[in-house]
Curated annotation (Swiss-Prot):
Family recorded in the similarity comment: Belongs to the long (4 C-C) scorpion toxin superfamily. Sodium channel inhibitor family. Beta subfamily.
Keyword match RNA-binding: no
Free-text function comment from the UniProt entry: Beta toxins bind voltage-independently at site-4 of sodium channels (Nav) and reduces peak current and shifts the voltage of activation toward more negative potentials thereby affecting sodium channel activation and promoting spontaneous and repetitive firing. This toxin is very toxic to mice.
GO molecular function list: sodium channel inhibitor activity; toxin activity
Entries under PROSITE patterns matching the protein: LCN_CSAB
Protein name in the entry: Beta-mammal toxin Cv4
Amino acid sequence: KEGYIVNYHDGCKYACVKLGDNDYCLRECRLRYYKSAGGYCYAFACWCTHLYEQAVVWPLPNKTCN
């Protein structure tokens, strides 16, 4: 599974500026999901890869980013 990492409180994606390989996104994806997850900056948000099927990613149901 793949997807954008999401803030559970506001429903927003984790923003990033440096597209492509990005240490911030990689670190956040691994902290949120697990150490074998991958992550990079895609369309100015952190995209996580190699996730388990039940991983919660953007968009959250009934939560819009404000």
